Structures are given as structure tokens and as C-alpha cells.
Amino acid sequence: MAVAAAAVAAPAGGGGARAQRSGLLEVLVRDRWHKVLVNLSEDALVLSCEEGAAAYNGIGAATNGSFCRGSGTGHPVPGVAQAPDSPAGVRTAFTDLPEQVPESISNQKRGVKVLKQELGGLGISIKGGKENKMPILISKIFKGLAADQTQALYVGDAILSVNGADLRDATHDEAVQALKRAGKEVLLEVKYMREATPYVKKGSPVSEIGWETPPPESPRLGGGSAEPLSSQSFSFHRDRKSIPLKMCYVTRNMTLADPENRQLEIHSPDAKHTVILRSKDSATAQAWFSAIHSNAGDLLTRVVADIREQLGKTGIAGSREIRHLGWLAEKVPGESEKQWKPALVVLTEKDLLIYDSMPRRKEAWFSPVHSYPLLATRLVHSGPGKGSPQAGMDLSFATRTGTKQGIETHLFRAEISRDLSHWTRSIVQGCHNSAELTAEITTACTYRNQECRLTIHYDNGFSISTEPQDGAFPKTIIQSPYEKLKMSSDDGIRMLYLDFGGKEGEIQLDLHSCPKPIVFIIHSFLSAKITRLGLVA
């Protein structure tokens, strides 16, 4: 049977068309591939392993009308208290049937005191968590242990708090830690949620996909929740995972070797989670990649607006406005097995900023992994290099920045040629705009054993003047326009050499530190002026 064809529709409201696609792919979970139904909307990707989904089959037949082996689609036979896969000493959703739970406690908050045992602890297993848009649920109660001895807890109970610490906004890991640290006497606030029973019966590969993308400055453990639990929109589809595409990194050939070119990867904004999907062939994989990448890219305008609202008038730093941002693959230095890594790159009016994940909180925007002034940065390579290009090198570009420590180089890879063009154009224009905005830079130097100042002006060129002494005005020793500069060089340590073709010959300036920033700034000024004059084709 052929793979379901992609359905493309334009969104309501007259905006640009975004791909909406549906079909069968495979997802990698715990080093095994599992068939899943994938639905792409304008802003999310939904993976599901549900009964009946095999009707859309395009990658092999399903088993017993379903796929995602291990999804727990079987149901207990009436009158049988225990399913075959439930250990005799464990209470599960197969043994604690919803109809056996008193109606009087359904959706009612209860306080239950549990005395931890030295062996076995509380004697429960939990599922759910904020990353799955679900409360923390008791999925198993071990018979004879502490929780079971209370005779007041049920499989399907949502744990609202532990010793007063609110778990309604907790991730799974946070809930585990809260229960571990709770001490010997534990007061649980719980509420039985009958609709959660299908979820806690048995997990599926899709339900094991971790994916947490909390909003900026979201409350963490103990922060409380403004909404009552019953009004929160939790999804109890145990075999469905919704992945918001906003600020996801959609790429290929990064995490896992893909010799057949059938895979695509979706990395979470916090860089903690990766979903790897595989198609039946290269062409189908490329079609899925293009659709998902396009939809994620269309959300960037909304992302920039959200960041501006979050940061307010201050901008990222010094009122610097975001001009462009997005994910790129960055080459890992050295001979590491991992050749590329995700990098969030942001261009402001004056800087190139690199983050290893999407900042969630306002203060995180002020702490990038790298921050480079565009004025001292240049684009030095774009597209395939000399000789046989390596995989991905045809969409790569490099930047070099002059710093006090020398030259720092970064090699990036875009996903499509349009992205490559946009990034390279944005960086070059950013360098030129920064040159015009800055207009002039001044640095201390020593010239012929005299303390001086070197000034480089965007329009007027170079000047060397003496340091003012005892209130006297500085004296200009040398002044020269860019047109007279015949050659410039440096020793990479502290000396800058300028030759204006005058009788004094080559001018030697001791900058007292690495000259690379000044060398790169001179290049930026010259490049911007040439471009402004229309001398670049």
C-alpha cells in the first residue's frame, strides 16, 4: 500500500500557505524503530499510536488493527481481576478498575498520610508530568507496601502535592525528586481522575518520548498553579504526542548516521530532547523534512515578537534590536565523533550572538555562549569548499572575528539554500550597517616611542594624534584617507603596520594588545564603503 499522500492547504485568513501533511513514519525510541501515524499542522507535529490508525498504513501492515508494539491496546476480560502482564504483587489499572473505585471520591481532593518503609519506600510508581501535559498519576501500587497499607490510594489518583509542595506544575523528574525527599511521614494530596485510566494501563513508545517546552518564566515546582486541576487541559491519550514546532530545530544527519538519507530530526528549543523520524525512502523523507522545516520557519516572526515583548525596551543588551535569528548546525572543533551540534544564532544591530539553547528567562538572553561584535566580524566562506565537499559542506558558511585573544572562527551549516542565502546576506549587511552606526573607533597606541591615539573614522579615514598633556589639545601627527592606504598587516601579537605611501614609509604602531580587532574593523569600514559606492557587483 502506498504512503498516504501529503495534503497541502492554505490556512484561513489569507496568509501564506503552510503544509499540512499526514502519513506513516517510524520513530526511534529506546534504540528501536516503531511505526507511528504523523500529522503535521501549521504549528505542531502529532505522533500517535492508536487503534484504527493502521487504516492509514503505508509502511507495512499493523498487528491486530494497531501498531506501535507495546501500546497496550488489549482490554481485561470482564470478571478477571488481573491481566497477564500485571505481576501478582502489583495493583495496576487492570486490577483497580474504575468501577471499583467509590463514586464519592471521584474528582474530590483527599489527604492521605503514608509512612515510608525502609525497604520499598512509598511503594508506588508514577506517570505523567508537565512535559506530557498531564498531572502526576499513580500508575502502580505495590501490594503490602506503604501506599497499599493505607487502603486509601488508587491507581489513577493524581498527586496534587507532597507535604504541601505543589506538584500540579511539576515535570515527571521533579515529582520523583519531591517524593524521594519527602521524609518518612508523607502527606499526599490526591484526586482520583477516572478519565486517566487508559493512560496508566500501559505505556507506548510514543508516550515515552520526553518533550518539555515550558513558556518563558513559567512557575516551577512549588510555584503553585492558577488553575484548578479539573479545568486544566490535560491530554490522556497515552498513544499520542504533540510537538509544538515553535523554535524547534528541524535538521538531518546530525544525531544519528543516516547512510540511506531516510531520516529527519526535530530538536526541542531547550536542546534536551530529540525526535528522530524515518521514512520508507529518501524522497518521502525529503518531502516531510521540507514541510516541517517550512512550518517551523514560518513561526519565527511570532518568536521575534514574543522575545521583544519579553525583553521590553532594553532589548538583548543596550537597546540592540533583533534583526534575525534561527537554528544552525555548528561544526564541533577537533576530530570529535560528533561533527555538528545545534546552535541558536541571533543577529542584533551590532552583534552576533550564539546560544546552545533557546533562552527561557529574560536574564538568559544576556548570557550567550559567544558574543561577537559585527564590526570585527567577517564572512569568509559560503558554499562548497575546494576539492570534494564533505557532507553538508555545500550549505555551509564560516565567520571570523578579531578578538583580543586572536581570530575566532565558526563554521555553520544551513538546512536549505534559501536559509544559506538569508544568513550570509544578513551577516554581511549587519557588518556594513554596524560600521555606519559606529562611525568611529579610537584606541591607544605607541608611535615612535610616543603615547598616541589611533582613530579610524568611517568617512574620514585614519588619524594618529598625541595624547593631550596638561590640558593641552591633542596634536595630529598623521592624517590619511582610505584611498592612500597601500597595505596593512600585523604580527598577531601587538604590532599594526600601515603603509600610506608617504615619505615616512611603513608606520609601526604598538597597540599594547592583539591587533586583530583593529585589523578586522578596518576591513569592515572598507567593505562597507565599497558596497555603499556600488563597487561590488
UniProtKB/Swiss-Prot annotation:
SUPFAM superfamilies noted in UniProt: PDZ domain-like, PH domain-like
CC annotations in GO: anchoring junction; cytoplasm; cytoskeleton; protein-containing complex; sarcolemma; synapse
Residue span, PDZ domain: 111-194
Record's bilayer topology term: Peripheral membrane protein
Residue span, PH domain: 18-297, 321-432
InterPro entries xref list: PDZ, PDZ_sf, PH-like_dom_sf, PH_domain, PHsplit_syntrophin, Syntrophin, Syntrophin_4th
Region annotated Disordered, chain positions: 204-233
Region (Calmodulin-binding): 517-537
Residues recorded as bearing N-acetylalanine in the entry: 2
Main location: membrane
Posttranslational modification: Phosphorylated by CaM-kinase II.
UniProt keyword annotation of rRNA-binding present: no
Residue numbers bearing the Phosphoserine modification: 86, 125, 204, 218, 225, 231, 235, 388
Single GO term (MF): structural molecule activity
Job of this protein: Adapter protein that binds to and probably organizes the subcellular localization of a variety of membrane proteins. May link various receptors to the actin cytoskeleton and the dystrophin glycoprotein complex.
Subunit structure: Monomer and homodimer. Interacts with the viral HTLV-1 TAX protein and other members of the syntrophin family: SNTA1 and SNTB2. Interacts with the dystrophin protein DMD and related proteins DTNA and UTRN and with the sodium channel proteins SCN4A and SCN5A. Interacts with DTNB.
Family indicated by similarity: Belongs to the syntrophin family.
UniProt comment concerning the protein's domains: The PH 1 domain mediates the oligomerization in a calcium dependent manner.
Protein's recorded name: Beta-1-syntrophin
